[in-house]
Amino acid sequence: KETMLECKNYFDQFKKDNIKNFQLKTGIFQSPVITNCRFECLDMTFRGTRIKASNSSPLIIPCIVRNKEGKRFKYEMMYKKDDLRQEKIIMDIIQLMDIILKREEKLDLSITTYNILPINNKEGFIEMISSSKTLYQLQKESFTIQNFINENNPDTTVREWKTRFVNSCVAHCIISYLLGIGDRHLENMMITNKG
């Protein structure tokens, strides 16, 4: 958490000064956005940082990280000036539901979850899911959901990805109903390349 608080200060300064070419080197830290994994953050750069168009104007921050096996990969996280504590609790409940369904019922509904780290009641970090788009983006790019999934899964049968898509949609609808999640619209509903 100390490293993330340090990063938060840099991000605040970035937004204030609009620095374009600032790089931050950090040591090893517990990733706030992937549970039970340890990464070494090799680079966080503002060169590719962008501000997402929304009411809270969150920062999308690119990182290069290395996992325990030594594999490097690109990673993005969102820094948002908003109270994320309620979202964190809801996402933890969804992750727990997924674990229980898989373990007790042997039921994999292809639920995609992400991690949230509230820093305080005014700001925090959100894991970005790679290879995903909002339904609004698909509509804007004139893609149908079927074409998007089919194009990204050439080695998967139509039956397989349709089953995965339907299962995740059903899970999403039931969980949203049970938890009283409203405000569902094309910009806050996402789909991964796998459906």
What are these regions (language model features)?
Residues 1-34:
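Charged, compositionally biased non-catalytic regions
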Residues 21-181, 193-195:
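Conserved ATP-binding subdomain of kinase catalytic cores across diverse folds
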Residues 189-191:
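Hydrophobic residue at the +6 position relative to the catalytic HRD Asp in the kinase catalytic loop
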